[in-house]
Amino acid sequence: MKLSAEQVVEVLRAAGESTRLRLLALLAAEELSVLELCRILDQSQPRVSRHLKLLAEAGLVERFPDGAWVFYRLAGKSSGRHLIGHALDLIDDADPAVRADADKLSQVRAERSTGAQAYFARNAARWNEIRSLYVDEAEVEAAILRAAGEGPFDEHVDLGAGAGRMLTLLGQRAGSALGLDLSQQMLNIARDEVAKAGLARCELRHGDIFATGLPGGCADLVTVHQVLHYLGDPAAAVAEAARLVAQDGLLLIADFAPHDHEFLREAHQHRRLGFEDAEIIPWLEAAGLRLENNIALPPSSDEGLTVKIWTARRPAAASIERSAA
């Protein structure tokens, strides 16, 4: 997209300050909360918020509240996005400030991952019980079966497989299946559940949802069930999941609609308190998928949460990125 001379000046003016340029570099890596940005930059919240406000007013970043937290990400459709991208590409990776920011971002990610993995390890044995605390699991599973369709599917890949429930739920509709998870404790339980279900052609593997190592277009059904709200970069996870979807294949995502159960961050390591359609659908479209179903399952009690199910299909004639992430 071409910009007017005045638009270029506005973009450069907004980005043309060292802290704001560092903020853009960090947000180019992933969405981050204001508190995380303050910690990485070692600056006060009022100061960081002021810089973020200027970047948002220039259309370079997007602000989105999530419960009591506020997150920022690079604006997806900003007219100045390409210009900023070129500016960031010019920065030397060895620049002391940028390198220090990258190191601190790595620390934040590591601590986030350690906390989540410790939580999963502690709770693996009672995972199905925990998963059912705020939703009617039977209703959700029935809706997932309807949304997935009868199949049969040649290959089902479940990302963030947890205790293996999606594998056993959909097991009779898939010729073969693969579940990936970072938690060995979860994988051990999933193996037991898969064995009990008699699913001989179902493999459990230690793997990262952001970099699965699987070839593009390898599955005609990919599921991501109650995983995104734990992740620091859900958009990247959706992109990787979509990359695995074969032509005419289906991606099924189940997660919470936005809610205000703030205690879930500490009690259950939720990073995000649900997702708007306005987030998920553009991520699917950007990955080359077409939305097929958008289902909301309201809670049966005041304490419950609304569950959303999004399904999207890759058009039969679409090209697929084959290389593994």
Explain the meaning of each model-derived region:
Residues 2, 79-128:
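Amphipathic alpha-helical dimerization/coiled-coil segments
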Residues 155-157, 162-211:
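Class I SAM-dependent methyltransferase SAM/SAH-binding core
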Residues 210-222:
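A short acidic, Gly/Pro-enriched loop at the edge of an enzyme's catalytic core
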